[in-house]
Amino acid sequence: MYVEIMQESLDYIEENLKCEITAQELCDRAGFSLFHYYRLFHTAVGMPVMQYILRRRLLHAIYEIGQGEKMIEVALAYGFETHAGFYKAFVRGPRDEQKVRLQDVHDRGYIYKNGE
């Protein structure tokens, strides 16, 4: 049951990366309190929900920039208010253990339906 709920949340996040997503919105969709949702999400994914959303936005933005899109347009599309805000989020990056955990979740196919 929890796996399906978390997968639905991850799918929703992935489909709405260019929109504002709040933790309250996600926990309401999942039917859990904010506290319980935070715990479930962190256990399933290995990082807090808002940090996960930021990482996914960064990865998508980097991909689009690599495809020739203008950096400022991509940054704004993914909710970064300024070029500087995007750069700061990009430079900060995930800690090594979070990179390993995120890659592990991705390798198991848990995050993406379409294997993206």
Sequence positions of predicted segments:
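…primarily DNA-binding HTH/wHTH and HhH modules…
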Residues: Y2, K88-E116
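Terminal helix-turn-helix DNA-binding modules in bacterial transcription factors
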Residues: Q7-Q24, T43-Y78, Q103-G115
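Helix-turn-helix
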Residues: E25-L34, Y38
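Core residues of bacterial helix-turn-helix
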Residues: A30, Y78-G79
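The DNA-contacting recognition helix of HTH DNA-binding domains
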Residues: L34-F35, T82-A84
